[in-house]
Swiss-Prot record:
Protein name (record): 8-amino-7-oxononanoate synthase
Entries under PROSITE patterns matching the protein: AA_TRANSFER_CLASS_2 (PS00599)
Amino-acid positions noted as binding pyridoxal 5'-phosphate in the UniProt annotation, renumbered to this chain: 108-109, 179, 207, 233
Role played: Catalyzes the decarboxylative condensation of pimeloyl-[acyl-carrier protein] and L-alanine to produce 8-amino-7-oxononanoate (AON), [acyl-carrier protein], and carbon dioxide.
Annotated positions binding substrate: 21, 133, 352
Annotated source species: Citrobacter koseri (strain ATCC BAA-895 / CDC 4225-83 / SGSC4696)
Nucleus is among the record's keywords: no
Protein EC: 2.3.1.47
Gene: bioF
Family: Belongs to the class-II pyridoxal-phosphate-dependent aminotransferase family. BioF subfamily.
Keywords, sorted A to Z: Biotin biosynthesis, Pyridoxal phosphate, Transferase
Length: 384
């Protein structure tokens, strides 16, 4: 088989399964409206949960940062790319979330890959929720450690897997809010099972941070859990991009020595760090509380109004509201129908989700209005 045959066969298999991914160039992709091909759609695919991507204070902070620092960092943080803007953001994040240290990364994917690659060795074991994000599971598979998966949100199954003999250290991996199902993990029970067996807990709270908990402190704060490793990302509730690892002083020092994704990557632009500090200020303010309250009301409006007779509505009280339709082709048809009716919705299919669980992944944001939710419900009712 040639290289071209290998590539062609893989693409043909995806097409045959109605699982081929496509990108669409949009004029505007965040916020209430999505604009593509000179047409405006109600946007139910954005992760900009609090509507901060267009917040004037955050935009101005980025502009001022660019005027002061330039548009790039100029290098790795270990060389010349760690600025006072990065330092201020790390210190603010650590204080906000109750950790000794925070380390910034260019993406959540990079943060997850970095911490697992740096910490795990041959005799170690990773025990991950089977629905954990691809970045976590890929990192676990690529690491020298053994990977075991526990049944989704099942602390008892987790405990049994942790009880099996292990020659090294054990790391439990889960998410605060799961990206494709929108449900939350029972973090207190999971952390208890881990602590009783001297295992550490890593929680990726990409979809909870900024959006839930007091001052938007996220899923762990809401459940009064402090994992040894907390990953927060900035492309959802913060409306920007990037990520951070929250940890102890010694773990931060260790990662600065051994996290290759951190050492050998150009750090985020200082202007971005300054914008993120501005986003954090909004999230923690009374305005941030008002935005979370409005989002919660929109989520309740949707769940109360959806007619789920032809769909399986996931048990989610987050901004992620998946409608499980099962068949790939049907999910694509429904997404096309909704777009024809002016609602931009994405069909999510395997391998992103398990086989037979293709879905419409609807996301609600603070930028929506009540009439937008009502329009979505009307279109869904007609499409179902």
């Amino acid at each position: 088989m040639t290289w071209q045959q290998k590539i062609d066969d893989a693409l043909t298999a995806r097409r045959s399964a109605d699982a081929l991914r496509r990108r669409y160039a949009v004029t505007q992709g965040a916020g209430r409206w999505l604009v593509a091909n000179e047409r405006q759609y109600l946007n139910f695919s954005s992760n900009d949960y609090l509507g901060l991507s267009h917040h004037p204070q955050i935009i101005r902070a980025w502009q001022q940062g660019a005027e002061r620092f330039g548009v790039g960092s100029g290098g790795s943080g270990h060389v010349s790319g760690y600025s006072v803007a990065h330092q201020a953001l790390e210190e603010a994040l650590a204080g906000w979330l109750g950790y000794s240290r925070a380390l910034l990364f260019i993406s959540g994917f990079a943060a997850n890959q970095a911490v697992i690659a740096a910490l795990m060795a041959k005799d170690d074991r990773i025990v991950a929720d089977r629905l954990s994000h691809a970045s976590l599971l890929e990192a676990a598979n690529l690491s020298p450690a053994t990977l075991r998966r526990f049944t989704h949100n099942d602390p008892q199954h987790l405990a049994r897997l942790l009880d099996a003999p292990c020659g090294g250290q054990q790391l439990v991996v889960t998410e605060g809010i799961f990206s494709m199902d929108g449900d939350g993990a029972p973090l207190a029970e999971i952390h208890r099972a881990a602590r009783q067996r001297n295992a550490w807990l890593l929680v990726d709270d990409a979809h909870g941070i900024g959006v839930t908990g007091d001052e938007g402190r996220g899923s762990c704060w809401r459940q009064q859990v402090k994992p040894e490793l907390l990953i927060v990302t900035f492309g959802k509730g913060f409306g920007v991009s990037g990520a951070a690892i929250l940890c102890s002083e010694s773990v931060a020092d260790y990662l600065l020595q051994f996290a290759r994704h951190l050492i050998y990557s150009t750090s985020m632009p200082p202007a971005q760090a300054q914008a993120l500090s501005a986003a954090l200020a909004v999230i923690r303010s009374p305005e941030g509380a008002d935005r979370r309250e409005k989002l919660a009301a929109l989520i309740q409006r949707f769940r109360s109004g959806v007619k789920a007779s032809d769909f399986t509505l996931a048990n989610s009280h987050s901004a992620i509201q998946p409608l499980i339709v099962g068949d790939n082709a049907r999910a694509l048809r429904l997404a096309d129908t909704l777009r024809e009716q002016g609602c931009w919705v994405s069909a999510i299919r395997p391998p992103t989700v398990p086989a037979g669980t293709a879905r419409l992944r609807l996301t609600l944001t603070q930028a929506h209005e009540a009439q937008d939710i009502d329009r979505l419900l009307e279109v869904l009712d007609g499409a179902g």
